[in-house]
Amino acid sequence: MNKPQTPMMRQYLSIKAKYKDEILFFRLGDFYEMFFDEAVEVSRILNLTLTKRNDVPMCGIPYHAAKIYIARLLRAGKKIAICEQVTEPVAGGLTERKVVEVITPGTVAEDDFLEQGSNNYLAAVYCSNKKTEGNSGFDYYAGLAYIDVTTGNFFATSFPKTDFKEQFLKEIGRINPKEILIQQSIQNEFPALKQILSEFPSMMQNFYPDWSFNPDQAEKRLCSTFGTENLKGFLLNTDSPEVPPAGLLLQYLEEISGRDISHISGIKIYAESDFVSLDDSTRKNLELLTNLRDNSPSYSLFESVNYTKTAMGTRLLRRRISYPLRSKNEIDKRLDKVNSLFKDGKASAIIRETLSSILDIERLSGRIAMQKTHGKDLLALKQSLNSVIRMGSLIEEKKLNFLQLNDEEKKLLTEIRDLLENSIDDDCTIALNDGKLIKKGFSKKVDTIKNIKENAHEILEKYLDDERKKTGINNLKIKYNRMMGYFLEVSLGNISAVPDYFIRQRSLSNADRFTTESLKQIEDNINNSEERLIEAEKEVFDEVCTEIGSHHCFLQKLAEEVAELDVNQSFAQAAVLHAWTRPELCSDSGILNITGGRHPVVENHLRAGDFVPNSIKLLSGENSNPEDETIPSFAVITGPNMAGKSTFLRQTALICLLAQIGSFVPAEKAVLSPVDKIFCRVGATDNLARGESTFLVEMIETAYILNSATRNSLVIMDEVGRGTSMEDGLAIAQAVSEHLLNTIKAKTLFATHYHELTRLEHEKIINLKLDVLEAEGKIVFLKKVVHGAAGNSYGIHVAGLAGIPQSVLTRAENLLYMRSQFQKERTIQEARPSAQGSEEKTPSSPAEKGLSLFPEEELILNEILSTDPDETAPIKALQLIASWKNRLSGK
């Protein structure tokens, strides 16, 4: 039989029924308590002690430390509902409680729960069920919208539903939202959705029915928020696939947070064709924002170029790295700005120092507009605006192309700064109830109350002095006790002089006590001055915030200008510190010509001068200029492990990417034609959760490249074909090479240990190798890329460096010697003249022709070495020998 529930538990269950998806923080005195399965889950996530009361699992956290635990739950992708006590506890009665706030990973606005240098995006995705005109013509489209409520940044894009899996994964990987709203029917339409979402385990997922994505309602909500009659100014209409998810985001923000979101004043629409395409594998393999080892920013490209001084600049730098430009003109505009700071080191140093004193204007103004702020925020904004004004004067003097404000905007900037200077007390705290919020002289009402609070004794003394003069009672006194409060005491000898407006309160043996209406008012003012001061200051503070919030659009624009300046000075600083050069961009030529290129990350972690620079020159296939026919488009790169192949591959891709985000590059010289896509297939791991082997993952990535690359792409491939038999791997590697070379004609760097590929003959192929110095049985990796094909992979040497036992190394050397001797014998036999009248056998099928570069004897030798005589049945052995004999004789 179930035990009867207490009134408090019935109250908990009643509130919990309304917040089924949230973790309910139920306030009990000085703790927030959780119960039942929720307590079990929270105790596991937060590593709390799980207890029981009346067989009910429970755990709790101190309310004063709640922010620490809330932050951890948000990072784990959880929603939290804060349930507070809203009435004072009554003996024997039940305290009233209600949910005062719901916090979710994508709607949180408090600094304590945010990463300063990263956006906190809330996203929504929708698939249209009717054809519309979009970036790729007339088609069925999916729309993706995402917003950072803390900054007001609002973006949306669309892509054909036929590309949903690739494009959705690509965009989600780029923006890394903390929370996403998903159209329910997408699960059925795209079974791969579950697979994609599993890649982002900490991203909170909310599924909404299709009717929630109503285009008409979404358009109305967007227009209402933006204050416009239609969405034409944002290149949108009711049929745009971006509209339904964007509208739902605003609805969700209003419902969950209950805040004013009027600071969200517009939305930026973009197309994939505006930016370089970077698939998920490429972003990870190039370690753009995080490294592959521990997923931290250390040893990433972001770390190598991040010399930003503001949180806004850091966030913009992340976005620029994730979204390189395709347009030569836009890239050159960015490079011009970097160059202006690169050339003027003195101005750049002053700008860097000034930027260091600018706080997060984007999020400060966002919190002010949402009325989620305090006095310290306003002081931080004032400090930041002062720094912007100082920096603006220097920029004008130097005629630099930054902080482009017109006269009206400059005036507004000064007015906002002056309002903050005059209104907010420099000694204020984050508390809004300590009476130290509003500066003296700004509000007459506040000043009056402060005067009463701070000068109560002087006010009473002045009143007493006035009454003495009016009554002529020189020994009139003001006294105080808890029972009567303040009162006037008149000695019996002066009772006859007491005026009519004195109100008798009590008679004593030697004196009488009186009050007056004026004294009552003074007492009331003194007793209530603290409460009245808090109310008055809060009223004035809200007025100041409302005024500043009304200029959020301007402050957001100002923040964007500061962020852009910060990113450009960061690029200039990287160029100065690491001797980077400005790349030269060429339109549509397909050229990639890097002289003395270096890996930006590896070089940063070596001693100065230790990194060995290398050059590469490639040109996309099919060029009209006859002189260009001698420039290769496809580089086959061979060399030992640890010689530097992967570093060379990645540095080439990173130099291209750096150029297209508008940065100088680590090279003596770089002449580049902007690429439309960068593919980087280097290394692979299995995906056991999906049932995918390492080889299958590699083939999936390779297939995506072959189906997506264009002539204007840059393709980086390392060790294609490994993970299967040598015959299959070699065949796949050659077939992939031929397709890239003859069909796609993209600029390609193809690293391999299949040395047979170096025998491919084509006017657009170049063989490159990593040079090695061999002397006295030892080898030195020179890290230098030179023309030619490697003759040895030195795998046994590298195995020795890794600590493989000497007995194993010796056996490997013997096997390698046997194989090389066998190969020599075959070479001698092939060199002998053929019998008179005999004809050379030619391949009889396309498949045989495709494999003509792969010596049959090497394949057979590999089979012999892998066959164990002790484990092979006699009949099987005879069959193998007959097969080898026939293949060697060409039958």
Curated annotation (Swiss-Prot):
One GO CC term, this protein: cytosol
Q: Does the keyword DNA-binding apply?
A: yes
- Specify the superkingdom: Bacteria
Q: Name one GO biological process term.
A: mismatch repair
Which InterPro entries does its entry note?
DNA_mismatch_repair_MutS (IPR005748), DNA_mismatch_repair_MutS-lik_N (IPR007695), DNA_mismatch_repair_MutS/MSH (IPR017261), DNA_mismatch_repair_MutS_C (IPR000432), DNA_mismatch_repair_MutS_clamp (IPR007861), DNA_mismatch_repair_MutS_core (IPR007696), DNA_mismatch_repair_MutS_N (IPR016151), DNA_mismatch_repair_MutS_sf (IPR036187)
Q: Name one GO molecular function term.
A: ATP binding
Keywords attached to this Swiss-Prot or TrEMBL record, sorted alphabetically, are: ATP-binding, DNA damage, DNA repair, DNA-binding, Nucleotide-binding
Q: Which residues of the sequence carry a binding annotation for ATP? A: G639, P640, N641, M642, A643, G644, K645, S646
- The segments labelled Disordered in the record are 827-854
Q: What does this protein do?
A: This protein is involved in the repair of mismatches in DNA. It is possible that it carries out the mismatch recognition step. This protein has a weak ATPase activity.
Against NCBIfam families, the record matches this protein to: mutS1 (TIGR01070), PRK05399.1 (NF003810)
* PANTHER family, per database record: DNA MISMATCH REPAIR PROTEIN MSH1, MITOCHONDRIAL, DNA MISMATCH REPAIR PROTEIN MUTS FAMILY MEMBER
**Sequence similarity:** Belongs to the DNA mismatch repair MutS family.
Name of the protein: DNA mismatch repair protein MutS
UniProt source species: Treponema denticola (strain ATCC 35405 / DSM 14222 / CIP 103919 / JCM 8153 / KCTC 15104)
* Protein encoded by which gene: mutS
